[in-house]
Amino acid sequence: MSQGMRQRVGIARAFALKPKMLLLDEPFGMLDSLTRAELLDVLVDVWSSEKITAIMVTHDVDEAILLSDRVVMMTGSPYAKVGDVLKVDLPRPRIRTEVMEHPDFYKYRGHLLNFLEH
């Protein structure tokens, strides 16, 4: 089974349990770009229909903007703490191919990148 298929199965199994909250740690980290895009679309669709609260760890700024209502940015190690919280106020449902065309996307992206650079 490919890595992408294993990720799909893992996400499907998690949602099949009907959790009230879902914790995801770099769920797309080991995937190629095409598989990542497909799974992002699947995750957005499932979240739209299931309305499950999810907490996700990611280092991908664009992924964070697409999937999040709030992005909690952590300071560096070894004593990491909350450094900033960005409210992402983009309309839902979000479509991956359209989010980057929204006028506020690059404002959010710039805010996140600025935090990461300092």
Regions found by a protein language model. Name each.
Residues 2-8:
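ABC ATPase nucleotide-binding domain "signature motif"
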Residues 11:
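Hydrophobic anchor residue at the start of the ABC signature
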Residues 17:
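Conserved signature/switch motifs of ABC ATPase nucleotide-binding domains
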Residues 22-25:
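Catalytic Walker B motif of ABC-type/P-loop ATPase nucleotide-binding domains
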Residues 36-50:
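Helical segment within the ABC ATPase nucleotide-binding domain
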Residues 51-57:
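Conserved H-loop
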Residues 66-73:
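Conserved catalytic segment of ABC-fold P-loop ATPases
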Residues 77-107:
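Conserved beta-strand-loop-alpha-helix hinge in the C-terminal portion
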